[in-house]
């Protein structure tokens, strides 16, 4: 497959990130490596989306702290960024709502075609008639006529500037879209782009708990978007999927990362990190990056047993 025919992917991880661990970052890296090795995908961005404060989980520190820790954890990454949208809403958002938000946002700011995990979308590029060739208006007539796929997620404002940082410098122009006044953006091309939910096997297993997830949401998450699962503690993902009719129905939409099942980061968790901090355990340096540890100590987080 050539670069232009591969499916382009953004990995989205939702969660408490209380705090964000080295395991979370490794989850992104392992998923990207695995998808690239299949020869069918190009991962062009990763998004960390911390949950809203009203989620109500015991010991959950404020989103202000969690967003800062997440930003510190990814500050050296050239493809993973932190998105505050979920935290900035008036109340807790479902995972399905977060996925739909980012899908709609990508449609607006990139103009590319987003599709379901199995069925390519026939939806026209936003702001363009279905039967007409898109005619962007250029401020600079010398823009390259064949942009690479990576350029679609170029700088469209500071809030999205880190979605895809692995891209060559290109000239910019003004794209006029009747549906979105976005100002200066990169030229786009029609490629297939999918947003996939990235999670551990513990979240996958939660789909099997009766009443925990709205079934309509599960249909959208697994059926329309798709999931990339990075197993933890050598979890049996086949057994997990067999316990849910929806997971069985859409098993082809669930990609399980099959690399080293004994990966050292697969046993790292936020819970272990909090306990290590509370007990002064030196192993915390194995769980959290140093900038995150420094921020936690400075802000006196997770010091008592209540979180």
UniProtKB/Swiss-Prot annotation:
Activity regulation, per record: Inhibited by P1-(adenosine-5')-P3-(nicotinamide-riboside-5')-triphosphate (Np3AD) and P1-(adenosine-5')-P4-(nicotinamide-riboside-5')-tetraphosphate (Np4AD).
Listed cofactors: Mg(2+)
Membrane topology according to the record: Lipid-anchor
Protein name in UniProt: Nicotinamide/nicotinic acid mononucleotide adenylyltransferase 2
Key words of the record: ATP-binding, Cell projection, Cytoplasm, Cytoplasmic vesicle, Golgi apparatus, Lipoprotein, Membrane, NAD, Nucleotide-binding, Nucleotidyltransferase, Palmitate, Pyridine nucleotide biosynthesis, Transferase, Ubl conjugation
Example GO molecular function: ATP binding
Record text on cofactor binding: Divalent metal cations. Mg(2+) confers the highest activity.
Subunit structure: Monomer.
Lipoprotein as UniProt keyword: yes
Residues binding ATP, per UniProt: 24, 271-274
Keyword Transferase belongs to the record: yes
Places the protein is found: Golgi apparatus membrane; Cytoplasmic vesicle membrane; Cytoplasm; Cell projection, Axon
Organism encoding this protein: Pongo abelii
Reactions listed under catalytic activity: beta-nicotinamide D-ribonucleotide + ATP + H(+) = diphosphate + NAD(+); nicotinate beta-D-ribonucleotide + ATP + H(+) = deamido-NAD(+) + diphosphate
Catalytic class of the enzyme: transferase
Entry-linked PANTHER family: NICOTINAMIDE MONONUCLEOTIDE ADENYLYLTRANSFERASE, NICOTINAMIDE_NICOTINIC ACID MONONUCLEOTIDE ADENYLYLTRANSFERASE 2
């Amino acid at each position: 497959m050539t670069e232009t025919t591969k499916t382009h992917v953004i990995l989205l991880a939702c969660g408490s990130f209380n705090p964000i661990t080295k395991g979370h970052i490794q989850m992104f890296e392992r998923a990207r490596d695995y998808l690239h090795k299949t020869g069918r995908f190009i991962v062009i961005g990763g998004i960390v989306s911390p949950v809203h404060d009203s989620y109500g989980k015991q010991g959950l520190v404020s989103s202000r702290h969690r967003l800062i820790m997440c930003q510190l954890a990814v500050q050296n990454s050239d493809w993973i960024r932190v998105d505050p949208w979920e935290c900035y809403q008036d109340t807790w958002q479902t995972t399905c709502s977060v996925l739909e938000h980012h899908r709609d946002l990508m449609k607006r700011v990139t103009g590319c075609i987003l599709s379901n995990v199995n069925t390519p979308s026939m939806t026209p590029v936003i702001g363009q008639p279905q039967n007409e060739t898109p005619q962007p208006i250029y401020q600079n007539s010398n823009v390259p006529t064949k942009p690479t796929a990576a350029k679609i997620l170029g700088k469209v404002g500071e809030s999205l500037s880190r979605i895809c940082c692995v891209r060559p410098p290109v000239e910019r122009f003004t794209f006029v879209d009747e549906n979105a006044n976005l100002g200066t953006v990169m030229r786009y091309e029609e490629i297939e782009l999918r947003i996939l939910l990235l999670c551990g096997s513990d979240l996958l297993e939660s789909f099997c708990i009766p009443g925990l997830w709205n079934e309509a949401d599960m249909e959208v998450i697994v059926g329309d978007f798709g999931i990339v699962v990075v197993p933890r503690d050598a979890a049996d993902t086949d057994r997990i999927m067999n316990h849910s009719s929806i997971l069985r129905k859409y098993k082809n939409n669930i990609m399980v990362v099959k690399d080293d099942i004994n990966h050292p980061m697969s046993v790292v968790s936020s819970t272990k990190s909090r306990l290590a901090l509370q007990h002064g355990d030196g192993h915390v340096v194995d769980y959290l990056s140093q900038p995150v540890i420094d921020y936690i100590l400075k802000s006196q987080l997770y010091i008592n047993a209540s979180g």
